[in-house]
Amino acid sequence: NAVIPFEFGPVGEVSAGDPLGPDDFGYICFDSRDEEWVDHPVYDWVEISSDERDADFPGTKIDFEFPDRQEAWDSWNSTEVVELPFTFRYYGTDYDSISICTNGWISMGAEGAENRSPEDWAIPGPGGADALLNVYHTDLETSDPSLSGVYYHYLEDESKFIVEWYNHDFGGQTQLRQNLTFQVILYNPSV
């Protein structure tokens, strides 16, 4: 056995303008700040809320069912399953549906529908949904159900499925009324 000494040279500094990864599956996470990279996203907001006057497309509002409100933490937490118009591969598994939660997350498949927690649990773990995609995961509420909601829409000609949380607030924080609106777009991987 021989010991061969060596030193690492500088490889540069990681900055907010650099992507994260790759992980064990080869995924790399780019965001809009990674402008120096060829693969950085250029986000094109597509408004699908029927509550918005300038909606680009009419989204379908999810009619969430709220369980027995026996627990204070569970007052506005719900998850519903929506069928995808294409098969979506996520970490090596194909899915034909997603579970959409009022608390700003989706999970691949129908198994996540049993979970509606606003808590940040380990992925995977007994307290959270598996195959999770945290879009803006926190305890969220609708300030006025007639003026807010969660919508989805499929743009067939562009092969993208959009989920939008429209006009939500931080849960239980009346002083933090934010009217949060955010969305995630899933692209058909076969196109």
What are these regions (language model features)?
Residues 1-13:
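Feature for long, exposed domains in two main contexts
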Residues 11-191:
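Von Willebrand factor type D
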